Amino acid sequence: MCGYVGFTNSIDNANIIIKKMMDKIKHRGPDAEGQYVDGDIALGHRRLSIIDINLGAQPFFSEDGSKVLVFNGEIYNYKSIREQLIKAGRVFKTNSDTEVLLQGYEEYGTKLLNMMRGMFSFVIWDKNKKELFGARDFFGIKPLYYANMGNTFMFGSEIKSFLVHPEFVKELNETALENYMTFQYSPTSETFFKNVSKLPPAHYFIKNASGFKCERFWEVKFDADDKPQLNDWVNKISDIMHDSVEAHKVSDVEVGSFLSSGVDSSYVAAIANVDKTFTVGFGTDEKYNEIGWAKEFSKAINKENNSKVITPEEYWGNLSKIQYHMDEPLADPSAIALYFVCNIASKKLKVVLSGEGADEIFGGYNVYSEPNSTFYDKVPMAVRKRIGKICEKMPARRGLNFFVRKGKTLEERFIGNAYMFTPSERKSILKVKTNAPTPTKITAPFYEKVKDADDVTKMQYLDLHMW
């Protein structure tokens, strides 16, 4: 993990300010730091060295010095793109994916984004055009925040780096607070800070004297194909998984793997052929502690398992630190376990694989079985709606919520796996009035893109974009 910061607009002591901003994200890159300050632009980078350890330092400059890059992430297919660029006449001075990214942008422009395979967040400053170009990977694995503060445009890997800039104004965005109560996080591009936004996944931006433009460069597609037989799908999934895991292991340092008792992380650990796996658990209850299973599985695949039981004291003692690193409220408790497992892994290596994101693709959430699980779904929707409205007005009683939910279309009732407070509940709890959009207004654009798909696919598509 690396991190970067930057801002436009000439300001006194820009080199001191950018250094303070870099120091705020030192935890993202303990191996090295670099900065570039020139009139209208200041860039800073903190590096965790993974590929071309000696020559991949940043900020990284183009051959003629006209462009400067700060980059967080990995381009897994950088070697094949590099070969294409060499055939096009490009000459390289390093073996890093950083240089491939910058030269690729010079050669292909925005087309490069769809050529790349990886996780990335980056910003390029064009000295001649006085223009910033930034982009974020397909699923938003790597972060990119930006803020408009008067004449100053700030950007970086974490919001906390903005706080030390003298022109940053720290104000609570109450709209994000209301959305958080339903989604467990801020589901739109807005953040908890006024005038601070996050670049959506699969988007790029251009910032110059003409203004700010943000556009999507990629869309995920769920193209169902019922023709192949089960064995065909087994073989296809196996091929894709092996290819993906092998691509993710592109590194000049050792790679490990997280391991729980789940199918996803177990599958990844088994085919990755790494030397070390990492697991954490809470207490001794098997519902919250999967260390025993992880050790047994690691032994079966002949790998070293590193584990830790998190005590209540460690849990509460680190909670504020965990929240600090997330910048914004996030009500997903799995973030705490991830913090601890990352902590034990970081003591032995720099790169780990995980099974995160597999439930959305493989339909792993229990709620995905709901559309096909009851005979009641065969009752006409008009009848279910009437029953649902009657039940909604009745005093709370076990079982009534089933009829309320089934009296609504999927688009009305399912707003993602993170659903917490209803719009009416959050309005009654909050003491402030906001113009926050309703949950269904936020999810509507995603449902529109898969309006002809089956309900399970719709749910997967929504979660893939919103959870």
Q: Language-model segments: which ranges?
A:
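Short, conserved phosphate-binding/catalytic loop or strand-edge motifs used
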Residues: 98-102
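Short, polar/flexible loop-turn hinges at active-site or ligand-entry regions and domain interfaces
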Residues: 85-93, 110-112, 163-171, 190, ...
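Short, intrinsically disordered, charge-balanced linker/junction segments flanking boundaries
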Residues: 271, 458-467
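ATP-dependent adenylate-handling active sites, centered on carboxylate activation for C-N bond formation
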Residues: 4, 8-19, 87, 128-153, ...
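N-terminal glutamine amidotransferase
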Residues: 1-74, 103-221, 242-246, 269-271, ...
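Short amphipathic alpha-helical segments and their helix-coil junctions
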Residues: 84-89, 441-455
